[in-house]
Amino acid sequence: MIHMLNAAAYRVKWTRSGAAKRAACLVAAAYALKTLYPIIGKRLKQPGHRKAKAEAYSPAENREILHCTEIICKKPAPGLNAAFFKQLLELRKILFPKLVTTETGWLCLHSVALISRTFLSIYVAGLDGKIVKSIVEKKPRTFIIKLIKWLMIAIPATFVNSAIRYLECKLALAFRTRLVDHAYETYFANQTYYKVINMDGRLANPDQSLTEDIMMFSQSVAHLYSNLTKPILDVILTSYTLIRTATSRGASPIGPTLLAGLVVYATAKVLKACSPKFGSLVAEEAHRKGYLRYVHSRIIANVEEIAFYRGHKVEMKQLQKCYKALAYQMNLILSKRLWYIMIEQFLMKYVWSSCGLIMVAIPIITATGFADGDLEDGPKQAMVSDRTEAFTTARNLLASGADAIERIMSSYKEITELAGYTARVYNMFWVFDEVKRGIYKRTVTQEPENHSKRGGNLELPLSDTLAIKGTVIDVDHGIICENVPIITPAGEVVASRLNFKVEEGMHLLITGPNGCGKSSLFRILSGLWPVYEGVLYKPPPQHMFYIPQRPYMSLGSLRDQVIYPDSADDMREKGYTDQDLERILHSVHLYHIVQREGGWDAVMDWKDVLSGGEKQRMGMARMFYHKPKYALLDECTSAVSIDVEGKIFQAAIGAGISLLSITHRPSLWKYHTHLLQFDGEGGWRFEQLDTAIRLTLSEEKQKLESQLAGIPKMQQRLNELCKILGEDSVLKTIQTAEKTS
């Protein structure tokens, strides 16, 4: 290699060092061409060609995709586009609901700190030049004075630097608090927390959006404001200072300014061409994080069932699969950042540094204020020190300005990442708002057109959503359904056009096979599911109380379990005391847990402390506490003994509570006056309940079931006896005669 360089240098009459430098430049240029050409070429390809190529190689079965998937694909990918600015402006209304807010105060303080740091940087740059001038002039007294000033200015400078970080964190926390408050208000309004999971399918993991996405968005906005505001101020003020200094010395600032603009423009174009789609990458990473968290929470919620089935291997594989998908996405982002940051550093550190030296040198060399050709040695020495001061000051200012421009251009990556978080947070609020207004969209699997469905199902094209045409009217007395169908969130009609009326004092027994719509009716009456057609007259929610088969045990004391969802203050406002609660527990045969668990103020994990029957009796105790006009009982005493169950129902009737009960126990029929029976095929009937006749029919049904259950065993034994005796059965002879006739 050395001999080749020597020969080449001799042939073209270059020095050996010059040839080595040119060879290094050629190698660097070749590497840059190899790195940048595929990226730029990919950008210049026609989108139509890519689309045709993708369609040509896509399998036929994959071309039939869901309409909802097509809608998602048509949405612009998160990035620096009009959709991003629109979403950011909408979120700004939440962050700054009015002019004078806590967030505005923190923002103003943060801005003052950023401006102060810029002026301090300019002052320190000038002070550095004066210190260097005193060294060149060999003035120790001046040097010591300037050095003391430099140390003194370090005190406010370090405070401002620390204040900038502190105020940035406070601003991010204020943004997060504002977003969380608004999100919680929307999430818990009009039972959105239930509907967004069970009625709508656009948010797979709302907990991820409510926690991680809001936090990352708030931090990104605050950090980006700091990373953009100060650099812009630095560029403006340092440019003004440099131009003013050059003009005062008789130098023209036009050349360096044009060079700086050209370099910045070229760098911006190259970085934009090479920049990956960080917005889409970050949004996908957040989605995979949320799904991994969802799988973990799903295992925790079903840990007992998984342990019984010994399904830990399957669940572990599922977790590993989700984690590997997340790790792959994170590695993809890291690899793209590696090459992008390498190109960014090469352009902004080395290319800009060389251009910066040229920009500093040109004004000093061409300035008439520094000419020293005809001066004596004394004035010439002064001119040298002035040049040194000017060069040092200009270099520091230029370095500060270059660093500011570098941060501005580096912020492009942060802006695209912010676009990903903005899209997820905005989409969360958008879905919450639509669900709150009764607009639901589900992502379901489309079935083939020739797929046969049972008669009761409602077939809808996936491109449409079910129109909510029903009306709900709050009344003081009675529950009336007029042509109200029971339709599941998936669009399946399980019962059509219900018509019945339950007045105060009536007690309705609801029966039917599994999946016929019994619990679904309670969801409609409670407002969880919408009324798609007809008219529903019902009391306000405070006059209706729903008790499920597995009552929810809240976090808190024993008192909180009885009065849920009221608080202790609400209980006192209603005029209840602990003695009243004791009487309620006596009526449901649950008073013993007060002494057993340590009194009303005992705080435990009640879902593990109470047995299944005790939880159900606690649910009935809540009914007696709230005293509703109507109680919706969904097999809420299936784990309670029959004698205690009967006493509780009798006490509820004595308290004037109208019962709407789903139960399979015949012992509870006598506490009801009317019957609503579903047939499981979309039909139903509503009639007055005659308990005696129904019990007689039930006994006859059970007798026939027991008799028919023994027929297969009797037939098997008869065949065995026929084989042993070698004879035919009389029944077989009769059946043969019937076939021949």
Swiss-Prot record:
ATP binds at G512, P513, N514, G515, C516, G517, K518, S519. PANTHER family: ATP-BINDING CASSETTE SUB-FAMILY D MEMBER 2, ATP-BINDING CASSETTE, SUB-FAMILY D MEMBER. The chain crosses the membrane at residues 107-127, 144-164, 251-271, 351-371. This is ATP-binding cassette sub-family D member 2. Homodimers. Homotetramers. The minimal functional unit is a homodimer but the major oligomeric form in peroxisomal membrane is a homotetramer. Forms heterotramers with ABCD1. Forms heterodimers with ABCD3. In addition to tetramers, some larger molecular assemblies are also found but represented only a minor fraction. Interacts with PEX19. It is a multi-pass membrane protein. Pfam families: ABC_membrane_2, ABC_tran. Residues 1-218 are annotated as: Interaction with PEX19. Glycans are attached at N190, N227. Disruption phenotype: Deficient mice exhibit a late-onset cerebellar and sensory ataxia, loss of Purkinje cells, dorsal root ganglia cell degeneration, axonal degeneration in the spinal cord, and an accumulation of very long chain fatty acids (C26:0 and C24:0) in dorsal root ganglia cells, and reduced levels of C22:6omega3 in primary neurons. InterPro entries: AAA+_ATPase, ABC1_TM_dom, ABC1_TM_sf, ABC_transporter-like_ATP-bd, ABC_transporter-like_CS, ABC_transporter_sub-D, P-loop_NTPase. The keyword Nucleotide-binding applies. GO terms for cellular component: mitochondrion; peroxisomal membrane; peroxisome. SUPFAM superfamilies: ABC transporter transmembrane region, P-loop containing nucleoside triphosphate hydrolases. Keywords: ATP-binding, Glycoprotein, Hydrolase, Lipid metabolism, Membrane, Nucleotide-binding, Peroxisome, Phosphoprotein, Translocase, Transmembrane, Transmembrane helix, Transport. The modification Phosphoserine is found at S58. Strongly expressed in brain and adrenals, and weakly expressed in liver. Its EC number is 3.1.2.-, 7.6.2.-. GO terms for molecular function: ABC-type transporter activity; amide transmembrane transporter activity; ATP binding; ATP hydrolysis activity; ATPase-coupled transmembrane transporter activity; fatty acyl-CoA hydrolase activity; long-chain fatty acid transmembrane transporter activity; nucleobase-containing compound transmembrane transporter activity.
